[in-house]
Amino acid sequence: MGNYKSRPTQTCSDEWKKKVSESYAIIIERLEDDLQIKENEFQELRHIFGSDEAFSEVSLNYRTERGLSLLHLCCACGGNKSHIRALMLKGLRPSRLTRNGFPALHLAVYKDSLELITSLLHSGADVQQAGYGGLTALHIAAIAGHPEAVEVLLQHGANVNVQDAVFFTPLHIAAYYGHEQVTSVLLKFGADVNVSGEVGDRPLHLASAKGFFNIVKLLVEGNKADVNAQDNEDHVPLHFCSRFGHHNIVSYLLQSDLEVQPHVINIYGDTPLHLACYNGNFEVAKEIVHVTGTESLTKENIFSETAFHSACTYGKNIDLVKFLLDQNAVNINHRGRDGHTGLHSACYHGHIRLVQFLLDNGADMNLVACDPSRSSGEKDEQTCLMWAYEKGHDAIVTLLKHYKRPQDELPCNEYSQPGGDGSYVSVPSPLGKIKSMTKEKADVLLLRAELPSRFHLQLSEIEFHEIIGSGSFGKVYKGRCRNKIVAIKRYRANTYCSKSDVDMFCREVSILCQLNHPCVVQFVGACLDDPSQFAIVTQYISGGSLFSLLHEQKRILDLQSKLIIAVDVAKGMEYLHSLTQPIIHRDLNSHNILLYEDGHAVVADFGESRFLQSLDEDNMTKQPGNLRWMAPEVFTQCTRYTIKADVFSYALCLWELLTGEIPFAHLKPAAAAADMAYHHIRPPIGYSIPKPISSLLMRGWNACPEGRPEFSEVVRKLEECLCNVELMSPASSNSSGSLSPSSSSDCLLSRGGPGRSHVAALRSRFELEYALNARSYTGWPQSVGTHTNPGLSLEEMNRGAQYSAVDKYGYVSDPMSPMHLHSRRNSGSFEDGN
């Protein structure tokens, strides 16, 4: 029994065929080299062969630097049969070789000059003469794919089964290169279809491996070729076409009248089904199972792998794994002779999407494998986690820990190994750290090369002022760069975090440098010289974040101002999603919506963003961004999410903007995400939210991503609401609390135009807006007790409300929101960390 961890990816015959391919490439290169005549020599030779007088005066001993005689040159430079005849009558030998090892006949055959070939043969050239690599003229004709030349040579006595230095016949070569017409001619002249090459490979093996269906049919027709012939590693043709995914050849060979043995094994114990699964050939595997039954499904190779294990080793075709699991003969927790499962195989090769799929479908991560190379008294039992750790697949280690126990049970970088000695493994693993460092260096070098020069900054160009924010990446400063007030996101080195800051930095810069939209934060440049100096510089947005405005400064905005912000954010997101390479933000929340002093908004912070095409495995394995605003499909990691995940987050931001409350403020972020994902709970929609917007909200946070609207539709509907804001405002009955019709029609003008709301101006209307909202609900005694006058102070309004307008956390809430009733019964946390 072999050790799975030492399973070779290439067989001995693979290595041999690679050498054979290289040798034939060298032969072709040498032939081309002989036929490349220098320009000055070529003109002289054209004159010699174009003039009888010049030809008669030329010396028979004439040779080029590459050793070509006049006979060779006649084949290379446009000579004719009379020149050939004359030169040979004068005693020039046709057997003379060039320095590259070829006689004149080989050059004539390679150039497919039938006239010269015939003339040389009639004048005494040896049709069986071997040149470089033991190749005869017939081999050269087969390599070049010249069927007429092949026929002429065979008519003049060439041995149809002659073998070269690697024991390939012309039929081997024709099958290898896919020359169908040459194959037909060779078969017509009696070529042996079952002759073996150096490693026992027949022409049928070669054609099956290369996928030349018509040649396979030519070889098999009339029961000429042995369809069950084995090479030195016991491969049959079905092994090769299954391995390389040639479905049409597999179907042809599995015809009942050909009597192919579909469950035959090679010296490694692999059936054709094993090889199809090792290479992710779903259609081939399905064909084999449907036509031949399930016998191959239960066979183990010498590395303790069934076909299911093989599919997990390949790991990139989950549909194939699903198909195999649907067969009654397959158990997801089947253990090979060494104890390893399909989950072990997937973990060892770093297939994180497959690992998650297997775990979700009942794979047992606590089953252990043993090292077969150890004696029975030295058991080294290892779970799949240890296999992943050994290969440096730290993301899989973290994922397995997540499935093993709640996230907060152990420190984030430790995991107790079950089935082992109880020791802890830390993340990153040694190999994982090396992989990460190598990838990071490559990413930085690539970014430096691709980033336009105008975005390259030196740290000396930046003037740092006060700190305006911080995060796991480092700190954000206000500063000055190139005569602009800017925000500087300064990264710090973090060697203990499994999530690479360098990776995040490179991704964010590569995305920001391609963005240009008034509703997306403007990129100024980045410092790339050294990881210790990494910094991203963007425009400074003076109004701060929407989160700060709503929940720290506790400002109340009128409906028009809210809609202006909502439209701007939707426009920014629409831009991201409509790019040639669409970008998914993945972290859209009120922290990352920044406000100008004029009340407009931009989308910011692209540290978690990805180009949609590059999501691949990362798409399934990360929970990017803030849990409280996370789409269910992202939180559950149950499917490949799309740009519609951003629409869900936007809907929560819109609700937050309209109500002034944090979504599920009574819950921790993870609990809020779990409630939305698993219990389909959504924030309550109060009467203060206009009906057109409430309808948009419900569609935006639809559990099914396909049911959510595109941002283009969101923009259109919100702009309609903005133009009709007077008709939707709860306070529209009192003109003192709303904008004039003319100003509401200005809402679609370009930024900075007249009639714009100003965040600073809104602060003076804070108490008035609250009073207007409270007055509009005086008919609802359950919600509001004492009537509140517009001129009352914040403290007086708090005392006058049955349910506090400003709670103990300092948040102002919609008095009609059902969240009040819930929050009074639940004490919760406003912590918004991941």
UniProtKB/Swiss-Prot annotation:
Autophosphorylated. One of its GO terms (biological process) is regulation of heart rate. It is an enzyme of class 2 (transferase). ATP binds at residues 468-476, 489. May play a role in cardiac physiology. Interacts with TNNI3, ACTC, ACTA1, MYBPC3, AIP, FABP3 and HADHB. This is Serine/threonine-protein kinase TNNI3K.
